[in-house]
């Protein structure tokens, strides 16, 4: 059994991460999960949420936007729409996006076609702020 997981995280635009890590956690459609070396093969969808991984004792955090997570042997492949490292997130921009989404949702009913779009925008902004705050605490 390998002691590390080889993680490849890609968006439609670029490879965001290619590292050997000790462990990784993410937010799946059914909740948060973690993977260690030697994990059984696994495939799940990801929702808007946080991905965290530990490498050489240092925890790193990223904000993800929808995708898929696959474990095969000691390789983890993560395919997502967007991914931002904690230190890349503009906290002021995330706060502004949160405010815009909250204001839009106040004016809409759940039956409105735009409601889910703004609901997802609100969730993305909240996750980005949560992840950025973790980078600020370092």
Swiss-Prot record:
GO molecular function: ATP binding; proton-transporting ATP synthase activity, rotational mechanism
Membrane topology (UniProt): Peripheral membrane protein
Keyword check for Membrane: yes
InterPro entries given in the database record: ATP_synth_F1_dsu/esu, ATP_synth_F1_dsu/esu_N, ATP_synth_F1_esu_C, ATPsynth_dsu/esu_N
Intrachain disulfide bonds: none
A Pfam family reported for this protein in Swiss-Prot or TrEMBL: ATP-synt_DE
The keyword Kinase is annotated on this UniProt entry: no
Leader sequence residues: none
Domain of life where this protein originates: Bacteria
Record's keyword terms, sorted: ATP synthesis, Cell inner membrane, Cell membrane, CF(1), Hydrogen ion transport, Ion transport, Membrane, Transport
Subcellular location(s) of the protein: Cell inner membrane
A single cellular component GO annotation: proton-transporting ATP synthase complex
HAMAP family: ATP_synth_epsil_bac (MF_00530)
Protein family per UniProt: Belongs to the ATPase epsilon chain family.
Subunit structure: F-type ATPases have 2 components, CF(1) - the catalytic core - and CF(0) - the membrane proton channel. CF(1) has five subunits: alpha(3), beta(3), gamma(1), delta(1), epsilon(1). CF(0) has three main subunits: a, b and c.
Function noted in UniProt: Produces ATP from ADP in the presence of a proton gradient across the membrane.
Protein name: ATP synthase epsilon chain
Gene: atpC
């Amino acid at each position: 059994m390998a002691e590390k997981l080889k993680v490849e995280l890609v968006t439609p635009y670029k490879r965001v991460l290619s590292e050997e890590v000790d462990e990784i956690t993410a937010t799946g459609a059914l909740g948060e999960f973690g993977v260690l070396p030697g994990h059984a093969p696994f495939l799940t969808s990801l929702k808007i949420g946080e991905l965290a991984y530990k490498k050489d004792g240092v925890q790193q955090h990223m904000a993800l936007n929808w995708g898929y997570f696959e474990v095969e042997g000691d390789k983890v492949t993560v395919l997502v729409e967007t991914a931002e490292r904690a230190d890349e997130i503009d906290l002021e921009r995330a706060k502004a996006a949160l405010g815009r989404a909250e204001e839009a949702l106040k004016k809409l009913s759940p039956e409105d076609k735009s409601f889910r779009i703004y609901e997802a925008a609100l969730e993305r902004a909240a996750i980005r702020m949560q992840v950025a705050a973790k980078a600020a605490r370092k």
